[in-house]
Amino acid sequence: MSSVAVIDYGMGNLRSVSKALEQVAGKVRIDVTSNPQRIRAADRVVFPGVGAIRDCMHELRRLNLDIVVAQCAADRPFLGICLGLQALLELSEENHGVPCLGILPGRVQRFDAVKADLKVPHMGWNQAHQVRAHPLWNAIPQNCRFYFVHSYYTVPDETSLVASRTDYSTSFASALARDNIFAVQFHPEKSHTFGLQLLANFLTWNGVS
């Protein structure tokens, strides 16, 4: 039986993510775990996260999961969600600058709260404009709406990494993809039909873009 590890480092939206995966899993086994051996044994890995990046990085290192994340992001289908996307970059300007995992080149910066009428965090439904084809977009229409909750967004060094963009005072990268990695700023587990479709696509994806 195929398996998916959902990484538990104390900051993920674990119940919502696991419940959503279970809805589309079929015969795929869902394992919510912080155990490095069980994570490494999984065929696919989901890296969720909510909260502050400094706490995220502290917990990953405390649990020796930073190395596990890097290993899994290198060799199997890997899905990052929200903070799990941001942690893949090199540096976040949150908390006066926090070094991240450095798996994808780029940085994380805050929305410009000085602009008139711009509410931070960016919270609610917004469109994801697909800028490149990818298996995880299968059966998901262009400009589909997903659910967002975040104050920071990724700025990748390479435009080729961007899989979708979303407008919120600026056009920001709402999904990044490279090889076996697909990572999203929105919450597919809270995005109803098309969020579930993205998760279902992930469970059948072979890790080839």
Swiss-Prot record:
NCBIfam families: IMP_synth_hisH. Its EC number is 4.3.2.10, 3.5.1.2. This is Imidazole glycerol phosphate synthase subunit HisH. GO terms for cellular component: cytoplasm. It is found in: Cytoplasm. Gene3D superfamilies: 3.40.50.880. GO terms for biological process: L-histidine biosynthetic process. Transmembrane segments: none annotated. Pathway: Amino-acid biosynthesis; L-histidine biosynthesis; L-histidine from 5-phospho-alpha-D-ribose 1-diphosphate: step 5/9. It holds the Pfam family GATase. IGPS catalyzes the conversion of PRFAR and glutamine to IGP, AICAR and glutamate. The HisH subunit catalyzes the hydrolysis of glutamine to glutamate and ammonia as part of the synthesis of IGP and AICAR. The resulting ammonia molecule is channeled to the active site of HisF. InterPro entries: Class_I_gatase-like, GATASE, Imidazole-glycPsynth_HisH. Keywords: Amino-acid biosynthesis, Cytoplasm, Glutamine amidotransferase, Histidine biosynthesis, Hydrolase, Lyase. SUPFAM superfamilies: Class I glutamine amidotransferase-like. The active site is at residues 82, 187, 189. It catalyses: 5-[(5-phospho-1-deoxy-D-ribulos-1-ylimino)methylamino]-1-(5-phospho-beta-D-ribosyl)imidazole-4-carboxamide + L-glutamine = D-erythro-1-(imidazol-4-yl)glycerol 3-phosphate + 5-amino-1-(5-phospho-beta-D-ribosyl)imidazole-4-carboxamide + L-glutamate + H(+); L-glutamine + H2O = L-glutamate + NH4(+).
